[in-house]
């Protein structure tokens, strides 16, 4: 069961990157490993309902149940203690990862207000890409009227690319909307 984006990768992206970087074997071509979604909900320390709504939103967006993240240390200025739930995260792999990226690239990112593309500088030096989304309502799975608060999330795309140039070429081949 190949998704649309996975089929596109095998038929179009692999030959294009082999030609661009001079790979001799298709297994050398960088590929997507996982997409990690993280939502930090600082207000969850005082109100548990906020965290429940964040978990529900993320499960709708990702298609699987997220893990509740807990604080590691007590911070008096943030009014949190060690072990209190303060967010949620989920890791998408294989088919769910490709489905999520397909929706992100073709539906969600164009729905962002004043969208001019994502920054091409958000690579970590080892071929992974990180980006933030300011509001979860850009995803089609979220009903705008049922949202209690606008929350953002972090999206980390992990690849097998050795360099940032390879990773950027991989994501650009997937028609990822880079600004520059």
Swiss-Prot record:
Short name of one Pfam family: Ribosomal_L5
Keyword presence, Zinc: no
Entry keyword annotation includes Transcription: no
UniProt KW keywords: Ribonucleoprotein, Ribosomal protein, RNA-binding, rRNA-binding, tRNA-binding
Signal peptide: none
GO biological process terms, semicolon-separated: translation
Molecular-function annotations in GO: RNA binding; rRNA binding; structural constituent of ribosome; tRNA binding
Assembly notes: Part of the 50S ribosomal subunit; part of the 5S rRNA/L5/L18/L25 subcomplex. Contacts the 5S rRNA and the P site tRNA. Forms a bridge to the 30S subunit in the 70S ribosome.
Family, per entry: Belongs to the universal ribosomal protein uL5 family.
Functional note: This is one of the proteins that bind and probably mediate the attachment of the 5S RNA into the large ribosomal subunit, where it forms part of the central protuberance. In the 70S ribosome it contacts protein S13 of the 30S subunit (bridge B1b), connecting the 2 subunits; this bridge is implicated in subunit movement. Contacts the P site tRNA; the 5S rRNA and some of its associated proteins might help stabilize positioning of ribosome-bound tRNAs.
Protein name per its UniProtKB record: Large ribosomal subunit protein uL5
Species of provenance: Xanthomonas campestris pv. campestris (strain ATCC 33913 / DSM 3586 / NCPPB 528 / LMG 568 / P 25)
């Amino acid at each position: 069961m190949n998704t649309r984006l996975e089929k596109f990768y095998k038929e179009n992206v692999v030959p294009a990157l082999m030609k661009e970087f001079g790979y001799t074997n298709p297994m050398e071509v960088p590929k997507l490993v996982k997409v990690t979604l993280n939502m930090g909900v600082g207000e969850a320390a005082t109100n548990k309902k906020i965290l429940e709504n964040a978990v529900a939103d993320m499960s709708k967006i990702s298609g699987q149940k997220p893990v509740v993240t807990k604080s590691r240390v007590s911070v008096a200025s943030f009014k949190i203690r060690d072990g209190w739930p303060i967010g949620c995260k989920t890791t998408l792999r294989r088919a769910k990862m490709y489905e999520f990226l397909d929706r992100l690239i073709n539906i969600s990112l164009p729905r962002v207000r004043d969208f001019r593309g994502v920054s091409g500088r958000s690579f970590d030096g080892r071929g992974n890409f990180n980006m933030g989304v300011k509001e979860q309502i850009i995803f089609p799975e979220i009903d705008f009227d049922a949202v209690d608060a606008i929350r953002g999330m972090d999206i980390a795309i992990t690849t097998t690319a050795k360099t940032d140039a390879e990773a950027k070429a991989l994501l650009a081949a997937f028609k990822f909307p880079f600004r520059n």
